[in-house]
Regions:
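The feature captures the beta-strand-to-loop junction immediately N-terminal to the Walker
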Residues: 45-47
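ABC transporter nucleotide-binding domain
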Residues: 176-267
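Helix-to-loop junction immediately C-terminal to a conserved catalytic motif
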Residues: 60
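A short, flexible loop at the N-terminus of ABC-type nucleotide-binding domains that lies
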Residues: 2-31, 38, 81
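Catalytic Walker B motif of ABC-type/P-loop ATPase nucleotide-binding domains
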Residues: 161-165, 170
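Conserved ABC transporter NBD signature motif
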Residues: 68-79, 83-84
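ABC-family P-loop ATPase nucleotide-binding domains
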Residues: 92-148
Length: 294
């Protein structure tokens, strides 16, 4: 999406100056700004305790920040009307399924809240993912419960899908199958997706954009393919590295001092430019980006 469209498209969600702290604790979110546009698939990355779950709960209006604003579909997130709520799908990190229900009872209950509920899709996924309809949820395996949560979130074709570690209890085959279903949903409906996971290979399969969370803020958000093309690691004396950055117009993302007046710099070129062949620049992996930027 070009920069003009980015500037003019009405966001699905927008957070501005959001700060949130738990009682008597340090702030978890610190003046955070974030925009999610229609059709974006964003992988949210951060260390344990960085505040990813808190951010997603604030995004959905489940936690109200002390300062700043959160808007979903042009409404305050904590005061959404029923029509706006019916456009959201959510898989929380901790299961919120009604364990005394059977899957059939649970899905019938939630069906009443969503005008776009797709019963054929539900039936297909229940069969494909081998979930017993009439077995009490408390008796299902952890992986089956996670699949059921995912079905509930996908069933009504949401315009915003928020996934907090949605595949952590699935085996590799189960993760791949869910991710394929997720990609199909995005391609069919242009769903906006926020996907938080520690499994970096999963993000490489589905996330077109990455958001790196550090210090209670979104430190960087950019398309994954652009980051792979534009980010390199430079190592040399401070003077050598600085001269190369200035010559190329590159920006520094992370600087690490080394012995002997040398430094290691993760740098990013301006969009539309390329690293010259003579530059002593090391390509980066998604793991490198995660380690340096979170």
């Amino acid at each position: 999406m070009n920069q003009h469209l980015l500037a003019t498209t009405t966001p699905t969600a927008e957070l501005a100056g959001v700060s949130l702290a738990y009682t008597l604790g340090e702030p978890v979110l610190r003046g955070l700004d974030w925009r999610l546009l229609p059709g974006q698939v964003v992988g949210l990355l951060g260390r344990n305790g960085a505040g990813k779950t808190t951010l997603l709960e604030a995004l959905l209006g489940l936690r109200e920040p002390q300062t700043g604003t959160v808007r979903l579909f042009q409404q305050p997130a904590h005061r959404l009307d029923d029509a706006a709520r019916s456009r959201i799908g959510y898989v929380p990190q901790q299961s919120d399924l009604f364990e005394a229900f059977t899957p059939a009872q649970l899905l019938a209950y939630f069906k009443s809240f969503y005008p776009r509920w797709n019963e054929a899709k539900v039936n297909g996924l229940m069969s494909r993912w081998d979930i017993a309809r009439d077995k009490r949820i408390s008796k299902l395996s952890v992986g089956q419960q996670q699949r059921l949560s995912n079905i509930r979130a996908l069933a009504h074709h949401p315009d915003l899908l928020v996934l907090d570690e949605p595949v952590s209890s699935l085996d590799p085959a189960g993760r791949r199958d869910f991710l394929a279903e997720l990609v199909e949903q995005v391609l069919e409906r242009g769903t906006t997706v926020v996907f938080s996971t520690h499994i970096l290979s999963d993000l490489e399969r589905v996330a077109f954009n990455l958001a790196f969370m550090s210090g209670g803020r979104i430190a960087l958000q950019a398309p994954l393919d652009e980051l792979m093309d534009e980010v390199r690691v430079l190592t040399g004396t401070t003077a050598e590295v600085q001269a190369l950055l200035q010559r190329l117009g590159a920006g520094s993302l992370k600087r690490t001092p080394l012995a002997g007046g040398r430094e290691r710099v993760m740098a990013r070129l301006p969009a539309g430019t390329q690293w010259p062949a003579d530059a002593d620049a090391q390509a980066v992996s998604l793991e490198d980006l995660f380690m340096e930027l979170t």
